[in-house]
Amino acid sequence: MKYILAIDFGLKKIGTAIANTLDKYPSAFHVFEVKNNFKTAVNNLFLRIKNDGYELEKIVIGFPKFHYYSDIQKAIKSFKQLLEKRFNLPIILVDESNTTSAVKDKLITMDLKHKDFKKAKDTLAAVLILERFFQNYH
């Protein structure tokens, strides 16, 4: 079975979500430390996918569509190039507009502790990005 991986990119951490291509139901996957070392983050992501036995069809990355030529856009494009080299898969940029506010709204209703809130925020954003991909692109 093939899977699609979604990434919510950040300069400190990336949240990920995954779904198989049949039922298209995204679930939170893992949070990876970045700390401005994109290559290590990509390698850690690759190893985790491989060790967990997932066969990826493609990767989608949340991309801030309305921040023209921002530093985060440049960082995402650099990260995307590293992913393409390491995974040799199609990498699709998906508009992530309003995902942050949607995540905050969902998490507030969950009444989580601060530590759990921060951890869930990264993966839930990736889940929303993957849902958006299935609704609009797939």
UniProtKB/Swiss-Prot annotation:
Name where it mostly resides: cytoplasm
Q: Which GO terms describe its biological process?
A: rRNA 5'-end processing
What single Pfam family name could you report for this chain, choosing any that match? RuvX
Write out the transmembrane intervals: none
Arranged from A to Z, the UniProt key words for this protein are:
Cytoplasm, Hydrolase, Nuclease, Ribosome biogenesis
Question: Which Enzyme Commission number(s) are on file for it?
Answer: 3.1.-.-
| Single annotated GO MF | nuclease activity
Localisation: Cytoplasm
Has UniProt tagged this entry with the keyword Endoplasmic reticulum? no
Record NCBIfam families: RNAse_H_YqgF
Which protein family is named in the record?
Answer: Belongs to the YqgF nuclease family.
Role of this protein: Could be a nuclease involved in processing of the 5'-end of pre-16S rRNA.
Q: What is this protein called?
A: Putative pre-16S rRNA nuclease
What is the source species? Answer: Mycoplasma genitalium (strain ATCC 33530 / DSM 19775 / NCTC 10195 / G37) (Mycoplasmoides genitalium)
Ranked from the top, the taxonomy reads: Bacteria, Bacillati, Mycoplasmatota, Mycoplasmoidales, Mycoplasmoidaceae
